[in-house]
Amino acid sequence: ENLSKEYPNDVRYRVMLGDSYLDNERPDEAYAIFQAALAEDPENAQAQLSMASYYERMGMDSLFYLQQEAVLMNSKLGSSVKAEVMRRIILQNEQTGKDSTRVLQLFDRMLSVPQEDATIATLCYSYMQHKQMDDSVGVPVLEKILEVEPDNIAARYSLLMVAVRKNDYAEAVRICE
């Protein structure tokens, strides 16, 4: 509280105060702080993540999912944090026995915008492998990895193996060039 009073223009301290309120069973106060922070800066990743935590704790599943999507589509948020959010979504999805549709839709939305690195695409491909999806489904993801990281040997090798399994030697040659 002292830091948020001392630095009233710093959203970080206010959001941290909101997190503290949420942890100490004061959800109404936490919600008001998160709402104010997001009204001031709708792209504030810390406030978005805190709001998602609020919705989850309050059992507001549909709002929780929407807030997760907002976090994942936030261009100010680094790929490592987005990957961590996706890992959590995947874990929850696996634990509840849901199908992979929502997870794949989230990956698709994330990969439809330019990526700073191959972290999200690599996680997506790993998920597809875990789900034993058909090779053809993973090809665009492998190509996305190579688009961002042309020297990614693992992605290039996987793409090459797909081409060889399909006896598409012209494609195999193209991949090796």
Regions found by a protein language model. Name each.
Residues 1-177:
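Alpha-solenoid helical repeat scaffolds
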